[in-house]
């Protein structure tokens, strides 16, 4: 598997190994992540608009955890910041960070797709 700035190779390899080295199962899990992430980002945007800090926190937490599971540690860190904003109810300044996280998600998605092709 290739190393990418968006993806922690060791984390992805550990996940792959824990799946018994089954590339099809990894592909299924990644597919679910790729389907879920846009909805989570939409939830973040909507919760920001409505000021619903708890919904915001939950969506950020989900993205943080799921991203970390696949080795997207930069994205996970961004989502951790967003989660903390939701936890404290301080959503000012969240919009640019959401956009940055969406950009990082796209980078990570490309890196994960490339890694999957090589295993």
PLM region spans:
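Two-component system phosphorelay core
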Residues: 1-119
């Amino acid at each position: 598997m290739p190393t990418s700035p968006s993806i922690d190779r060791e984390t992805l390899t550990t996940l792959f190994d824990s799946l018994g080295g089954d590339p099809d199962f990894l592909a299924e899990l990644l597919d679910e992540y790729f389907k879920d992430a846009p909805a989570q980002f939409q939830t973040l945007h909507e919760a920001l608009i409505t000021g619903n800090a708890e919904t915001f926190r939950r969506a950020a937490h989900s993205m943080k955890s799921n991203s970390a599971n696949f080795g997207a540690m930069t994205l996970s860190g961004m989502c951790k910041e967003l989660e903390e904003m939701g936890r404290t109810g301080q959503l000012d300044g969240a919009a640019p960070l959401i956009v940055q996280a969406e950009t990082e998600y796209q980078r990570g998605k490309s890196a994960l797709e490339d890694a999957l092709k090589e295993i």
